[in-house]
C-alpha cells in the first residue's frame, strides 16, 4: 500500500512539473519575438547615443555632417593631395578622445600609424572617414560605439559602448 501511495504521489508530482513546464514554454518568446525585442532595445540605445553626439556637436559649435551609418565627420583643413582609395596604405597622425574630452590615445609624432584601407584592423568608423579624405586633410570623426569598439570597448582605455572622437591628419598614401 505504501508503494502505491508513493507511486501515486510521484506520478502526481511529475504531472504537476510537466504542466508547469508547458506553461513556462508558452510564456517564453519565440526567436522572432526575441529578435524584435533585442532590435528595439538596441535601436533605443543607438538613438540615445545619437542624441548625445548631436548635443556635443552643437555644444562645441562643430560644423559636422552625419553619414548614413552614423559617423559624424568634419574636414576642417583641406589638403591638396590625392583622394584615398580602398587598398591604399594610409599614413596618419591621430589622437583619440572620449566624449568626456579625455584624451586616451595618440600617434607618436615620429611614427605615424599605417594601415591598409579596406582590410580591417582599425575601427569601422575610421575606415569610413579616411575614405572621405585627401592627402594633407585634417579631419574630426565622431564614432558612435557601433562604429568604434562596440559593447566590450577595447579592454584597456575605451569603456563599454563608448563614443570616441578621432582627430586625424592624412600624412600620405602608399
What do these predicted regions represent?
Residues 19-174:
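Cross-family detector of peptidyl-prolyl cis-trans isomerase
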Residues 1-19:
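Sec-dependent bacterial lipoprotein signal peptides
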Amino acid at each position: 500500500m505504501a508503494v502505491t501511495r508513493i507511486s501515486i504521489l510521484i506520478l502526481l508530482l511529475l504531472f504537476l512539473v510537466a504542466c508547469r513546464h508547458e506553461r513556462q514554454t508558452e510564456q517564453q518568446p519565440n526567436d522572432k519575438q526575441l529578435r524584435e525585442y533585442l532590435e528595439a532595445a538596441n535601436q533605443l540605445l543607438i538613438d540615445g547615443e545619437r542624441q548625445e553626439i548631436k548635443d556635443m556637436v552643437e555644444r562645441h559649435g562643430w560644423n559636422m555632417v552625419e553619414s548614413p551609418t552614423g559617423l559624424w565627420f568634419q574636414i576642417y583643413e583641406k589638403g591638396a593631395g590625392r583622394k584615398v582609395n580602398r587598398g591604399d596604405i594610409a599614413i596618419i597622425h591621430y589622437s583619440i578622445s572620449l566624449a568626456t574630452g579625455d584624451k586616451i590615445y595618440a600617434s607618436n609624432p615620429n611614427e605615424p600609424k599605417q594601415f591598409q584601407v579596406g582590410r580591417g584592423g582599425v575601427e569601422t568608423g575610421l575606415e569610413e572617414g579616411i575614405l572621405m579624405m585627401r592627402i594633407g586633410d585634417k579631419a574630426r570623426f565622431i564614432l558612435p560605439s557601433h562604429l568604434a569598439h562596440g559593447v566590450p570597448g577595447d579592454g584597456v582605455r575605451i569603456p563599454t559602448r563608448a563614443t570616441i572622437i578621432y582627430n586625424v591628419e592624412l600624412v600620405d598614401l602608399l
